[in-house]
Amino acid sequence: MNDRKLARKAASIVRKHARDKPVHIRVEDRVVYLEGAVSSYEEYVRIGREAGRLKGVRGVVNRLSFPEKMERKRPVGKKECIGEADVVIVGGGVVGCSIARELSRYRLKVVLVERAEDVACGTSKANNAMVHTGIGEKMGTLKQKLCVKGHQMYKKITDELQVPYEQQGLYIITTRDSFAKTKIPGFLGNFIAKHIVPLIILRRAKKLGLPMKRVSRKELLENEPQVTERALAAVYSPTYGITCPYLFTIALAENALANGVEVMLDTEVVDITVKDGAVSSVVTTRGTIDTSFVINAAGLYADEIADMAGAREYTIHPKKGATLLFDREASALINRSLSILLFPRTEHYKGGGLMKTIDGNLQWGPTMREVFDPTDTSVTAEEIQAIFARYSLLAPRFPKNAVIAYFSGLRAATFTEDFFIEASRRVKGFIHVAGIQSPGLAAAPAIAEMVLDILRGEGLELERKTAFNPYRKGPPVIRHLSPAERERAIAENPLYGKIVCRCEEVTEGEIVDAIRAPIPARSVDAIKRRTRAGMGRCQGGFCLPRVVHILSRETGIPAEKIVKNGRDSHLFVGKAKCLLEGECEN
């Protein structure tokens, strides 16, 4: 479909949803640009989504204003040149760090820039950690292609980086409730759920070369006693994987660092300089980096980064997913991850489920809800109730009082609802790696290889290093060691014998290792992600003061200036004595 036809189709969408609103439409190179105003965020999303569904559309840039719209204030950058790089990667999530590691194989000066104080601080830290096989993705999409390939790469990479990864398997289950909210009569819905749906899944699996099998109701209930008696059938996917997304991201970054990549944390990009139609430099809060190539892996802010270069071809609309986390003891009641199919399916949402984590806890979720604020990681009472309502259909007898925490993460979706990975058609040297929502974790290794091919096609010379080392030695995890191994570790370092976090059996030695790591932990949450201190039943109620003390001692940062997860998240307002006596400086 050419630009003129796309413009006519887009105009009909606007007339349908915003007839009386001042909306301007233009189409360039199969990208739909929307400008003007609408009545609500829901209307903004609806128009963007329908434009994204148009056949042949590459992207949707939705600049429509709505009453709730927030303008993010950017910090001031520094023009002073602080160095040069062949490639600058914007974003320290799993995708950015995968690309950094892949580029570290070559004789290049690579700089990774991350606005947070640590890597894996966005979507990469708050997801269900599933390494999807590709069975749940729309056929023919870039998502599906890269998910299938990335899934096949995981075992080798996680072995090299000493990151936990298991193919625990997943049951995809249909029940008598699967078609309850449709107009299909009950007896017919049950027949479809029991016989037709499993057949469709198996046919799709065969096309993708995935080893999946049908499981009878009897076998399912024998293997998973917590599953509802209303279950009708299931399909088992034995290769469904699980990892720790933040440990994986940290390991990728550490290995990239060891192979020569410069990692700049707490550094925000505020502008991209373009000269004669090509990338010239990246302006950050720490200074300017001269470069000819920028890889935009900025997740929720990818459209803003593209805007800085005059290369915007999409808009990110955040989708929030809330998740409940259960105590490890209760989680032992479930043997494999479980997913329930409910119809009609919510568009662009796989449905979540009861997901086993690599550490043995169970997660219920995630949900999916459009939000306009890219920092909204709240969890509401309504979202918790929605989680219980949906997944109790699958495991009604599961002890719900075993919840120990809840959290939410944000998916960085474009309106075409597919990955947007290509060289900019407007600015030479600017590479889009945007719209990386689920299954981005699974696809990350394949995305990195794809980006490498794009860079090669754009003229970047890639000469392999002979000294590249793909291996990374992970820190010791004392709770996983045998008694003899523990004794040896404690003999070498007595701090491994001092328990700080009782719930997760984390020692002082492990916390010190995290603080002294190649990418050092400088916040309470950074230590939590590396060691699990504070992730147990008491959620840091016991160990938090001790973690703060160790962090202060090792870094020289006063305890009252220690942060939870970023520069504005101080845990304390000051020392109690000086506050009471009025001697505080501030």
Regions found by a protein language model. Give the residues of each.
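N-terminal targeting leaders
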Residues: 1-92, 96-101, 105, 131-133
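C-terminal catalytic lobe of FAD-dependent flavoproteins
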Residues: 2, 8, 29-33, 42, ...
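Active-site substrate-recognition segment that forms the wall
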Residues: 88, 98-105, 115, 161-167, ...
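Glycine-rich FAD pyrophosphate-binding loop
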Residues: 105-126
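Short beta-strand to alpha-helix junction loop
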Residues: 138, 143-148, 179, 191-195, ...
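Helical element adjacent to the flavin cofactor pocket in flavoenzyme catalytic cores
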Residues: 235-293, 301
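Iron-sulfur (Fe-S) cluster-binding segments and ferredoxin-like electron-carrier domains
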Residues: 375, 507-518, 541-559
